[in-house]
Amino acid sequence: MTYIVLDLEWSQPVCREKMRIAGTRVLQVEIIQIGAVAVTDGIVSEDFFSEYVRPRYYTELKGRIKKLTGITKNDLKNAHDLTVVLKSFRKWLEKFGKDVIIVTWGPDDIPTLVKQCEFYERDTGWLPEWF
């Protein structure tokens, strides 16, 4: 069994009026980094995943986000968009086979990832079981 410890960082609209809406889908936050490490048989792997994501809509980082994450606008300037980073993350996950469970530090990471995929009309069927 391999546990993937996932941590997402995200940006927010600067105000409620700037929140992005597409039909019935609302983009409350936008992922700006995906980080993960594998733990197999209680051993933390040296193999990890960490990529910045270039935001499409919430490009202005609030001071609180910069302070909390240490991520700057410059870090995101040359990053790939979410679609490309998700493909890379999915490929990274595949090396661990089917016996994988995703765990997170908090309750928001997986729902945020799922909502982002839904907003951008991306499949979520590839996501392994998660807690």
Describe the predicted segments one by one.
Residues 2-111:
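Conserved non-catalytic scaffold segment of RNase H-like nuclease domains
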Residues 108-130:
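Substrate-recognition/cap helix-loop segment adjacent to the acidic, metal-dependent catalytic center
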